[in-house]
Design a protein with these regions (language model features):
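Gly/Ser/Thr-enriched, mixed-charge loops and adjacent short helices
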Residues: 1, 14, 110-179
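N-terminal amphipathic/basic leader segments beginning at the initiator methionine
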Residues: 1-19
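Electropositive phosphate-/nucleotide-binding environments in soluble metabolic enzymes
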Residues: 5, 18-26, 30, 57, ...
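A residue-level signal for conserved active-site and pocket-lining positions in enzyme catalytic cores
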Residues: 9, 85, 165
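Short, N-terminal intrinsically disordered low-complexity segments that are rich in Pro/Gly
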Residues: 14-26, 45, 49-52
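Glycine-rich phosphate/diphosphate-binding loops that line cofactor/substrate pockets in enzymes
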Residues: 29-46, 169-175
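A generic structural signal for well-ordered alpha-helical segments enriched in polar/charged residues
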Residues: 30-34, 38, 65, 69, ...
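Ferredoxin-reductase
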Residues: 33, 41-118
Length: 179
C-alpha cells in the first residue's frame, strides 16, 4: 500500500484498483467525517457530484455509505461540472463537497476532488489528516439510531448552478459571440 493518497488535485487512479476502490472510498468518507468534526466544523452536510464515468455510481455509493455511517447528511447532485460542486458546497452550507472525477485522465480512471465549506480545494492540512486516517486504518466510530446520516437526491442542483452562472454575468450580453 502506498504512503500517499492525495496528489496535486485530489486522489486519482484506475477505477477499482487501489486507491480508487469501494473499500478505500468508504474509508475516505468516514475519514472526511471525522476530520470535519475534529476541525471544529459545525457542518454535518456533504455534497457529492460526479462526472459520467461508469465507475462514478460505484464510488458514489461507497462514499455515501462511509459518510452517512459516520453521521453526515449527504446531498447527491448526480453528473455535474466540477465548478458546480464547488459552488453548491458553499451556497448550500455544506462542510465539504466531493467531486468524483479524474478530469482529463482516461475514462477507466476516476478520482475524488474535495472542497472545503468555502467551495475551494480542501486545505493541505485537512487532506493530510484524511490521508492519515485512511492509510493508518483508523477505526471508524460509527453512529447508531437517529445519529446515522441521511442521503438526499437534489433534483434542482443543475438549475441552481445555471442561475448562479447567469447572475454572475450581470448585464453582460453574449450577442455575436461564437464558441
Amino acid at each position: 500500500m502506498t504512503t500517499k493518497l492525495f496528489g496535486t488535485d485530489g486522489i486519482r487512479g484506475k477505477a477499482n484498483e487501489y486507491p480508487i476502490t469501494p473499500e478505500i472510498t468508504l474509508r475516505i468518507g468516514q475519514a472526511i467525517s471525522r476530520v470535519l468534526r475534529s476541525s471544529g466544523a459545525n457542518h454535518n452536510r456533504v455534497i457529492i457530484g460526479k462526472d459520467t464515468r461508469i465507475s462514478g455510481y460505484m464510488l458514489e455509493t461507497a462514499l455515501t455509505s462511509g459518510l452517512v455511517s459516520s453521521g453526515m447528511d449527504v446531498f447527491l447532485v448526480g453528473p455535474m461540472p466540477t465548478p458546480a460542486v464547488a459552488h453548491l458546497t458553499k451556497s448550500m452550507g455544506c462542510g465539504a463537497g466531493i467531486m468524483l472525477t479524474a478530469s482529463h485522465n482516461p475514462y477507466e480512471d476516476n478520482g475524488l476532488k474535495i472542497f472545503g465549506p468555502d467551495g475551494f480545494k480542501l486545505s493541505d492540512d485537512l487532506e493530510a489528516l484524511v490521508e492519515q486516517e485512511v492509510l493508518y486504518d483508523v477505526k471508524a466510530n460509527g453512529v447508531t439510531g437517529d445519529k446515522i446520516g441521511k442521503a438526499y437526491r437534489i433534483d434542482d442542483a443543475r438549475g441552481r448552478y445555471i442561475e448562479f452562472v447567469k447572475q454572475s454575468l450581470g448585464n453582460a450580453h453574449l450577442d455575436g459571440m461564437k464558441i
